[in-house]
Amino acid sequence: MLMYLDDSTHKIIPVCAKAECKHNSSDCNAVLDSSYDNSPLHYYKGSLYVVKVEGGMAKLERIAKDGSSREDVADLFASDDGTVSLVFHDDCVYAYDRIGHMGAVESKDTDKVVIVKAELANGKTSEVFSYEGANNAINEARSFGDKLFFLINHNSIDKETLTADVNYKLYCYDYATGSAELVSDKNISDYYVD
């Protein structure tokens, strides 16, 4: 259930604008069903945003901050779970699957992880970055100035020796030019850009 904490009264209130709602059924605007599992809630320019998964598709949804309305903004990419992370910048959202193909038993060299840009005004989507290879995921994306930084995480296990192969590469995507480049392959597990 989507709840609001009133700082002044310290009361927790369901985010539902229905006057007679008892907040105990699926008709309540504050109810988030299982299609929203694992999806963090984001607040951007007066609206709430969340990702739901329906019919094998991750969908970006905008919710009025008082809970009075919901609207689908964009179909992001195929997904069977709610492991989609979002970064907002300049009235767009950049979405990626933070689990990807990491540690997948059947991951292949042709598997691809992507970052998809969705324009919040019209829902238009475009793939702005892709990385191909087995056992990879995109992690820790953050916006710094005019660039989106993120990690490519490779995580696999050798079935015969049972040894793990874990490494990270830092990339950046330039919002203005639409180009991405490798910043470091020195196995960086966390970062900050100043």
Locate each region found by the language model.
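Surface-exposed loop/turn elements that mediate protein-protein interactions on large endomembrane-trafficking
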Residues: L2-D27, G56-F77, G103-E132, I157-N187
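Residue-level signal for tight coil/turn positions that link beta-strands
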Residues: T9, N38, K45-G46, D90-D91, ...
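Alpha-helix-centered segments that form part of catalytic cores
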Residues: Y44-K45, Y49-V53, N167
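Extracellular, repeat-based ectodomains that mediate carbohydrate processing or recognition
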Residues: V84, H89, R98-I99, V113, ...
